[in-house]
Amino acid sequence: MAAMPKTLAAPTATRPGTLLRRLSPLLSPLLAAVLLAGGPALTPAYAKPPAKAVKSAKATKATKPAKAPKAATKAATKAAADPALVSAGVPAPVAAALRRAGVPAAAASFYVVRLGDSTARASWNAQQPMNPASTMKLVTTFAGLQLLGPDYRWQTSLYADAQPGFDGTINGNVYLRGHGDPKLVPEEMAKLVARARAAGATTINGDLVLDRSYFAEGLDSNGTIDGEVQRAYNVGPDALLYAFKTLSFTLTPDPATQTVAVSVTPELAQLKLDNRLTLTNGRCGDWQSSASPTVLPQADGTVLASFSGDYSSDCGEHVLNIATLSHAEFTWGGFVAEWQRAGGRFARLPALRSGKVPRGAVLLARHYGLPLADIVRDINKFSNNVMARQLFLTLGAEMDRGGPASTGRSIRVVQRWLARQGLDMPGLVLDNGSGLSRAERISAYDMARLLQQAAASPVGPVLIDSLPVLGVDGTLRNRLTRASAAGSGYLKTGTLADVRALAGYVDAAEGGRYVVVSMINHANAAQAQEAHDALLQWVYRGAH
């Protein structure tokens, strides 16, 4: 057996941080079972704080070189920086950027350590629990990979009251039962339908009953974080989540015909489009305000998406995402549309009903979704909130059986898992596992410990591969694209109105991989990106 790594030494307490203002809207984009072998957990060497202050920090390439001599530039940078931050190992350009952004030192938290080292290169406010925003997805996805395994797949099943008759007709209801697949999109629903058609089903003479009992009811009883119910990032979890419960409208101007074409995905059986957009030749302007549709149910049971107003040819093609309808209505429309697309028929339009699959029902088809490794990649690359919440709830359902999945059961599962890893986190507060929360908390130090543990685990490569690559893809595709550090960072981002966070790994130019965690909780957090960029480039240059 390999020698166990050194155990943790907690960082020296620094200036106490205070959690500042209440958080408001998340502005992140939407997007997308082999259990691990047993054995002793690898406990990596957790780092101590630096013994003494870093005396200087190199200027980053993200800023144009000053004409003044380097010594004068460094002196000016240090003069603009908070000396307490610099004495804690935080590079002077980072501290100076915080000051320029109007972010007090107490509102920031940093922890940087080279993998395998026992001493941190930078540690500031590291024990203070902070709101991590979407970097909390690292806890959920690492737990998912370890507890469920990278090859875990969600199942969705179709049952019927009876086998299809000789003519392919099902006389009775059909039942669609979900187990929380985070990515049950049209392509996946089509596979389920194809299996049912291959089993001989051609016509359904009954209702469509949705069995969503795998998840508890009322998971979104507290509402959205900001009241923006039509924003895709606010979609709540459901055992039969279909296509993220979001309609994606594509607006395409055609100057040749002086029209604006509108298409939509996914196709819903009850959805109708009324396109009255007028193509103009002016400047694009605020196209979303002028071209956003109203989506309203009609007396005949259809749902009408109405477009009106002007749309400039200067805007080009755009996609507009709108979360709408209930989960049940959305999934009903998606199944009916896919059934008809595959050549299936209905003796009459099936009514939408909810309920459990009855005993004695006949299994028509079962579909296994994408493997967890692929799901984790979508969650972390694109910071998909509802997919993270689906995974978080699945942890409770799979590892703490005995009833519908709930956030409480999932929280207990994750806490027990952390304890088995030797990761005691007294300041950890879990809410929904996605970071789209005003309540969730974790310290930079604890996040760094988690990342060190992940790097030493068998699923470490899968987790790291799921992270956005600095300047290349995901939520980091536009960050430091021309800097020397581009392509060398693998980091999860976190964004709320008053939060900016980064957590992950940076490969230094001289060799070695570093764990990097930074969290800023302040009303001016959005102005502090320069501090994060300077930190990443400092680590890339060797963190010295």
Predicted features and spans:
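N-terminal secretory signal peptides that target proteins for export/translocation
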Residues: M1-R22, A53
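Bacterial N-terminal signal peptides
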Residues: P25-G39
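Signal peptide processing junction and immediate N-terminal pro/mature segment
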Residues: L36-K52
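Conserved serine DD-peptidase/penicillin-binding transpeptidase domain
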Residues: K48-R100, L147-M425, A534, R541-H544
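A short, well-structured edge-of-sheet supersecondary motif
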Residues: R99-W124
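Residue-level preference for non-acidic, small/hydrophobic
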Residues: S118, K137-G144, L208, L240, ...
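Small-residue-rich helix-loop
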Residues: R121-S123, V185, F382, F392-H544
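Short active-site loop at a secondary-structure junction
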Residues: S123-A143, L147
